[in-house]
Amino acid sequence: MSIQIPRGTQDILPGSVELWQYIEGQAREICRRYNYKEIRTPIFEHTELFLRGVGDTTDIVQKEMYTFQDRGDRSLTLRPEGTAPVVRSYVENKMFGDATQPTKLYYIGQMFRYERPQAGRYRQFVQFGIEAIGSNDPAIDAEVIALAVEFYRGMGLKNIKVVLNSLGDPASRQAHREALIAHFKPRIGEFCSDCQSRLEKNPLRILDCKRDRDHELMNTAPSITDYLNEESTAYYEKVQELLTMMGVPFEKDPNLVRGLDYYQHTVFEIMSEAEGFGAITTLSGGGRYNGLVQEIGGPEMPGIGFAMSIERLIMALKAENIELPIENTIDCYVVALGDKAKDHAAKVAFDLRKSGLSVEKDYLNRKMKAQFKSADRLNAKYVAVLGEDELDKGVINLKDMATGEQEEVALDVFASYIAEKLI
């Protein structure tokens, strides 16, 4: 019996991986333009990091984490999200002491959640995320959202929208929390068991429930906007003003809360309205987490960030029938005819690769027709044919696969000649 891939995972094969590489390259490029630097953290962390950083009342912590005991009886968890590990690294490596603040970081990496596999949701998935730590300026909130929108637009997506809300500062959140408890408590028995347990611990999460979202009490729940104090209201309005100035359209949704406990003030999601999805689908989300650095053991430092699923992005591209400009070709295929030519072909391929070209050759001693078929399948720009006759003349036959034109080139200058054509 053959061993198969674990449920909720996928192999990304040659022919598909080029799309991923292109997307990751564009993510790195936009981060370069906004001056975000890459950070790489371990794929597993101490479980305590996520209990404190993500929140022990969240679905991620309660239901979705891959947690195990190592041989030293330490509890470790495969990272389910990227923000807490980045903040842990920020604190541990004392990045808060840098002269230039905020510290602007990005990551592209695999995350792990034990979820029910479905379209666009895997148990191992790839996130692209950014974190800006060390500034309480609404301008950085607007910048983070604008970066995400610009990235999606750069991918060609048109049917996207930004949904925005504010959860306020701790005082505003506490006032809203008390109002939510008073609103839901008399009829909490009508809600699912998750919502019942959330009532006292984190009633805001009830608004995020998928099972009870159509309950009449959801539609009449107290809105956070009614409990924002003057400072929180001013902050929220400034973020909106800056987004408008940047040409980033948005919709306000007072029920948007996000699924993690560390958010304060600005929260947002970017959604796809593409008809190919069949329903509005969240592509990415993020927000401000002013208490997280301190919770993980650092000084009081504000932060904001977002994370997006690469798998969801690829689904959105397909839903909008967008084909990215991915070049899946090689520069030259070397055809060898005969044993003597085969040895020289290896040297030709080596010299071409040294010149910076992508090159392939035959390793199965096939006939010329079969080798040309391989060159076609690999989308070779040129085919170099080397046989006994060419060796005797000290030349190589070069064919342009786009035009069909052929020419003979001296062997001793062939590498530099074709490199000049292609580089």
UniProtKB/Swiss-Prot annotation:
Signal peptide: none annotated. GO terms for molecular function: ATP binding; catalytic activity, acting on a protein; histidine-tRNA ligase activity; transferase activity. It catalyses: tRNA(His) + L-histidine + ATP = L-histidyl-tRNA(His) + AMP + diphosphate + H(+). CDD domains: HisRS-like_core, HisRS_anticodon. Disulfide bonds: none annotated. Its main location: cytoplasm. InterPro entries: aa-tRNA-synth_II (IPR006195), aa-tRNA-synth_II/BPL/LPL (IPR045864), Anticodon-bd (IPR004154), Anticodon-bd_dom_sf (IPR036621), His-tRNA-ligase (IPR015807), HisRS-like_core (IPR041715), HisRS/HisZ (IPR004516), HisRS_anticodon (IPR033656). It is found in: Cytoplasm. It is an enzyme of class 6 (ligase). One of its GO terms (cellular component) is cytoplasm. Keywords: Aminoacyl-tRNA synthetase, ATP-binding, Cytoplasm, Ligase, Nucleotide-binding, Protein biosynthesis. SUPFAM superfamilies: Class II aaRS ABD-related, Class II aaRS and biotin synthetases. Pfam families: HGTP_anticodon, tRNA-synt_His. GO terms for biological process: histidyl-tRNA aminoacylation. Its EC number is 6.1.1.21. Homodimer. Belongs to the class-II aminoacyl-tRNA synthetase family. This is Histidine--tRNA ligase. It comes from Bacillus cytotoxicus (strain DSM 22905 / CIP 110041 / 391-98 / NVH 391-98).
